[in-house]
Amino acid sequence: MTIRNQRFSLLKQPISSTLNQHLVDYPTPSNLSYWWGFGPLAGTMILSVLSSPALVSGLMVARAKNLVHSVLFPIPIFFSINQLFHYFCRLPIIKHLATKCQLLLFLISHFLLLLVLTKLVLDLGGYLFMDDLSRALSQFVPGFSGGLGGGSNTPPNPSGDFFLSSYQTSDPDYHDQRRGDSYFSSAPGVQETHRHASGSSTNLHLNLNDQSQDPIFLEVERLSLKCDKVKEKTILKTQSLLLERGYHIPDERDIERAINVVMTEHETIDIDRRRKRFYYLYSCLGKTGNKFWMELLETLADYNINIKSDSDN
C-alpha cells in the first residue's frame, strides 16, 4: 500500500479510532507530530519550545536568561509529558471524562502553568535587572542607588525626578543656594564647584557676563549700534531739512520724539534687516510724496512744528 493510500484510509476512519491508534494512552511528541501532519523532528522541536519557558529568554538579560534555562527548562526533561498527562488523568474530575476532553484540558492547563512560571521569571528578572542598572548609574550620578544594593544614600524622590533629587540631596551647595548663601546671593562672576561621586570636581562658570563673548551676541550688538547711528543721522538731517524749508521748531527735542513714533514699527523687525531699513528711511527724507516723509510731517505737526506763516515773520 502506498503512502497516499495509507493517508486516504486514515481519513476514512473515525476520529476516535485514529486517536486510539496514534495517541494510545498519552500524547508523546512523536505521536502528536504524526497526528498533526508534521515530521517527527519538526513536531519534537515545536513541542519542546512550547513546553518550556525558553521563549522568553531572548527578552531578558543574561542573568535572567541563565535563570530560565537552569530552573525551568529541565522541568520537561525530568517530568515528561507522559508522566504529567498520566497524573493529570488520575484526578477525580478528569478521570471520568473522555480521552479527547482530557487531552484538551491537559494542554490548556499546561499552557496556563507556563504563563504563571513565565510571569514569575519576568518579575524576578526585572527586579534583578533594575538592581544592576541602579548600581551602574550610581557610579555617575550620586545618590541614584536610593537604598538598593550597592548604595548607601537616601531613597530617590517618589515623584520620579531621580536625577534632580539625587543632585539636591548629595550637593551641599544646593542647600546653601536655597538659603541664599551661595550663587543666588553673590555677585556675578562667582564660580561654583560641583563634586561628583568619583571625587573629581568641575567648575561651573556662572558668570552672567560671559555671554558678551558670544559671537552672535557681539554681532547683534554691532548691528544695533549701527542702527542707532543711522537713527541719529536721521534726526539731524530732518532738523536740517525743516530749517531749510522754513519750519518753526519750538523744541528741537520734539523732532526726536516724532521720529521715534514714526520709526517704532520699523524697529521691531529682525536685526539683520533693520539696518537696511533704516538706511532706506534715511534716503526718503525730504522726498515730497514719500509715505514715510509725509507721515513724519504729520507727526511733526502734532508737535506744533509747521512752516512759518507770514504773521510769524
UniProtKB/Swiss-Prot annotation:
Keyword set, alphabetical order: Membrane, Mitochondrion, Transmembrane, Transmembrane helix
Membrane topology according to the record: Multi-pass membrane protein
Cellular component per GO, a single term: mitochondrial membrane
GO biological process annotation, one example: respiratory electron transport chain
InterPro entries linked: Di-haem_cyt_TM (IPR016174)
Ranges annotated as spanning the membrane: 41-61, 68-88, 102-122
Cellular localisation: Mitochondrion membrane
Anything else known: A stretch of 270 kb of the mitochondrial genome is duplicated within the centromere of chromosome 2 resulting in the duplication of the gene. The expression of this duplicated gene (At2g07718) is demonstrated.
Membership in a protein family: Belongs to the cytochrome b family.
Name of protein: Uncharacterized mitochondrial cytochrome b-like protein AtMg00590
Organism of derivation: Arabidopsis thaliana (Mouse-ear cress)
